[in-house]
Amino acid sequence: MLIYIDANLAQYCADHKDFIFGGNGVPPVNEPKLLRELEALQQIVKLEQLGEGWHVPAPKHLMKELLCKPTNNQRGVYSILLRVWEKAGQQEANDADEETITQIEQSLYPLKLKDKDRRHLAEAIALGAVWFLTNDESLINHTRPPKFRNHLCNVQGVYVARPSECIPEISRGLFLNTDQSD
């Protein structure tokens, strides 16, 4: 399963890697909404270990944004993300399809997303991601009709969600995959 992590979440992962990846159980922040999403990222990492493996892409456009002004800690985590993506053999396929990404990006104009958000979502769609995880409330609101702001919505095959919103679905998917393998 391909999970596209928006730039803001990639930065949180880098800044709080010890908490998210299980090395440190002490909550790194006091702000309740951010803490909920960091705990959800921590749970997603634990769920990944139960599944058949997930891919988190590191396309050029995302990496360019992440590497604008990273801290040393962020730079280290981003280099790991890029190495894993390249090792999975996904980088070549991603780089070759700029025309498709541009077409998808144009189809997203009616959503009135910020340029960077539209580009990232178009990349996620072009790569065949199942999830586009973000903590950007504006992005989430622009991809959900007003009556459905509290529901998961699919944008051209990709669910745009906060980490905390995707856990029930990912858990259910793992359960169904495990149940079918018996």
Predicted regions and their residues:
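A short helix-to-beta-strand connector/capping loop
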Residues: 52, 86-89, 153-158
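PIN/NYN-family metal-dependent endoribonuclease catalytic core
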Residues: 5, 10-73
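Short, aromatic/basic amphipathic alpha-helical patches
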Residues: 71-84, 142-152
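Acidic, PIN/NYN-like endoribonuclease modules and their adjacent C-terminal/linker elements
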Residues: 2-4, 17-18, 22-29, 110, ...
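Active-site neighborhoods of divalent-metal-dependent phosphate/nucleic-acid chemistry enzymes
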Residues: 88-133, 137-141, 178, 182
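Noncatalytic, typically N-terminal accessory segments of nucleic acid-processing enzymes
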Residues: 1-2, 8-26, 84-86, 93, ...
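A short acidic, often aromatic-flanked loop/helix-cap motif at beta-alpha or helix-coil junctions
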Residues: 64-65, 91-102, 163-172
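A generic local structural motif
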Residues: 42, 118-120, 146
